[in-house]
Swiss-Prot record:
GO MF entries: phosphoribosylanthranilate isomerase activity
CDD domains according to UniProt: PRAI
Catalysed reactions listed for this entry: N-(5-phospho-beta-D-ribosyl)anthranilate = 1-(2-carboxyphenylamino)-1-deoxy-D-ribulose 5-phosphate
Cross-referenced NCBIfam families: PRK01222.2-4
First-level EC class: isomerase
One annotated GO biological process: L-tryptophan biosynthetic process
Keywords of this entry: Amino-acid biosynthesis, Aromatic amino acid biosynthesis, Isomerase, Tryptophan biosynthesis
Record organism: Pyrococcus furiosus (strain ATCC 43587 / DSM 3638 / JCM 8422 / Vc1)
Full protein name: N-(5'-phosphoribosyl)anthranilate isomerase
Record family assignment: Belongs to the TrpF family.
SUPFAM superfamilies, per the entry: Ribulose-phoshate binding barrel
Listed EC numbers: 5.3.1.24
Protein's UniProt keywords contain Isomerase: yes
Pathway stated in the Swiss-Prot or TrEMBL entry: Amino-acid biosynthesis; L-tryptophan biosynthesis; L-tryptophan from chorismate: step 3/5
Length: 208
């Protein structure tokens, strides 16, 4: 089980996270309360022993290009309606690994219809990883019936409202390739060592 812990803001948080997780993420050029300056993102990327995703709601090629150049990012996580051509050009120009986020409703009136709509949207993108999320930093679970249907067709990373208490059940229901967490392993807005360790342990020990 691939485990990513997102939204770190300092080298101290990096030290906590990289002991346990497979990847982490830094939020830039976004309205998120976890956003950090590009210079700090670069420092974290340069000091990390695990992949660091540059996470943003940026849309245009020039915005992403500038951020990639200034941080040295090799991994990006796109939380916007960036065009498929933009993703293709970023991959071609910078050789970046792209995780593209897609929003899943919190409550679906028709899970099969929503899953098919998502699969159609996902198919337009040449993404290396697909993230199914409730919405940028919402801290809420999405409708797992939808993500489980999508996960039957393609490998997905699940995010939104995860914590050590629910991650095992979510994995059993959805059967994803991986999970991504941020606020669910924090205390007072800071990544907590015990919560991080417990989340990763539970996620990686699930049998399904």
């Amino acid at each position: 089980m691939f485990v990513k812990i997102c939204g770190i803001k300092s080298l101290e948080e990096l030290e906590i996270v990289e002991k346990h997780a497979d990847a982490t993420g830094v939020v830039v050029n976004s309205n998120s309360k976890r956003r950090i300056p590009l210079e700090k993102a670069r420092e974290i990327i340069e000091n990390s022993a695990i992949p660091v995703f540059l996470v943003s709601t940026m849309v245009g090629f020039s915005e992403w290009a500038m951020a990639i150049e200034r941080t040295g990012a090799q991994y990006i996580q796109v939380h916007s309606n960036a065009l498929p051509q933009t993703i293709d050009t970023l991959k071609k120009e910078f050789g970046v690994f792209v995780m593209k986020a897609f929003r899943v409703p919190t409550i679906s009136k028709n899970p099969e219809e929503d899953a098919n709509r998502l699969l159609s949207e996902i198919s337009r993108y040449n993404a290396d990883m697909v993230l199914l999320d409730t919405g940028a930093g919402s801290g809420k679970l999405h409708d797992l019936r939808v993500s489980s249907l999508v996960a039957r067709k393609i490998p997905v990373i699940v995010a939104g409202g995860l914590n050590a208490e629910n991650v095992e059940e979510v994995i059993k229901v959805v059967k994803p390739y991986g999970v991504d967490v941020s606020s669910g392993v924090e205390k007072y807005g800071i990544k907590d060592p015990k919560l991080v360790e417990e989340f990763v342990r539970r996620a990686k020990n699930v049998v399904w």
